[in-house]
Amino acid sequence: MSLSVTRENFDEWMVPVYVPAPFIPVRGEGSRLWEQQGKEYIDFAGGIAVNALGHAHPALREALNEQANRFWHTGNGYTNEPALRLAKKLIDATFAERVFFCNSGAEANEAALKLARKYAHDRVGNHKSGIVAFKNAFHGRTLFTVSAGGQPTYSQDFAPLPPDIRHAAYNDLNSASALIDDNTCAVIVEPVQGEGGVIPATKAFLQGLRELCDRHQALLIFDEVQTGVGRTGELYAYMHYGVTPDILTTAKALGGGFPIGAMLTTQDYASVMTPGTHGTTYGGNPLATAVAGKVLDIINTPEMQNGVRQRHDAFIERLNTINVRFGMFSEIRGLGLLLGCVLQTEFAGKAKLIAQEAAKAGVMVLIAGGDVVRFAPALNVSDEEIATGLDRFALACERLQTGGASCG
């Protein structure tokens, strides 16, 4: 018999690094979730841009169950068919020639930064170790990636941090140019800063970074953990900009909810990662890669990408209508189905309160700092789910504006 659990048990048993919602989801289907008491939610959070095809997608369940009936794990002393097939799909769909599989976005970024340092050390010398990243970025929670992230809130308690990492202002090419030099081994950037406020890069900014990296023989790393796998209306966001990175990291939506990450790069750069230089026990396991292969099959189609663009327009239209009613947002921005509503000054710092009110109204949303409400729904969210979910979101906005909101 299963142990009966409640939300209070989290506070009793778990390390307190999270403050979860007061309800526990127990079942999902498409873009809907149900909690223990049966209340329904429209899910516009998507597991933080992970559940690209919603909950319990039948094709993903079939892929997982089929592989689970064969074998689950062997370790990196052996390869497996699903991993090889997924690698080929990623290579065929992108600039990449080589793939490294891991379990998360942080691990993918860790691998990318290690590769960049090793490539520079092997080809130039150990003095070429500098990494340029951007303020308010987010690249993961390992010591290396949290240091690259440029958000002191996440890193200040863990000093001393890895050296030779400097941070420029995002979307400011002059700021980046002042830091990138011949001692720089890599520049790591998000095409859309997610945690930093859902801020798309300008084309001129990314093109300028590409030129600076070429000039100084530094590798350009695109962190597409949040923007990748169809989220922006292209398979990867770099395709919007006409700027090709040297290394791309991907995770989140790649597994559709099953943990997987990947680092993509070229043969030349990959060649320095010789046997033993890096590794992972679970990365590229057959369960994860079988599911991810099916995710890619479904998402990497013109129909799906066109659908993302159409759903983007539907969200923008309805969010603008909500804003006409309540005047809460100074800007609605983003690409595809990664959207951010920036709060007006009078509502500054209340993004979390809005998210809490939205949950009470039956819709799950995210935040990106204290001043931005973030949406990252399933890419196949239906018109009805968009309409119903945003009606519920409008109710939350009304409650906040009229003073009916509470912090409970």
UniProtKB/Swiss-Prot annotation:
| Matches recorded under SUPFAM superfamilies | PLP-dependent transferases
Q: Which cofactor does the UniProt annotation name?
A: pyridoxal 5'-phosphate
Q: Which reaction does it catalyse?
A: N(2)-succinyl-L-ornithine + 2-oxoglutarate = N-succinyl-L-glutamate 5-semialdehyde + L-glutamate
* Record PTM N6-(pyridoxal phosphate)lysine, positions in chain: K252
GO terms, biological process:
alpha-amino acid biosynthetic process; arginine catabolic process to glutamate; arginine catabolic process to succinate; ornithine catabolic process
Q: Which family does it belong to?
A: Belongs to the class-III pyridoxal-phosphate-dependent aminotransferase family. AstC subfamily.
Record's function text: Catalyzes the transamination of N(2)-succinylornithine and alpha-ketoglutarate into N(2)-succinylglutamate semialdehyde and glutamate. Can also act as an acetylornithine aminotransferase.
Designated name of the protein: Succinylornithine transaminase
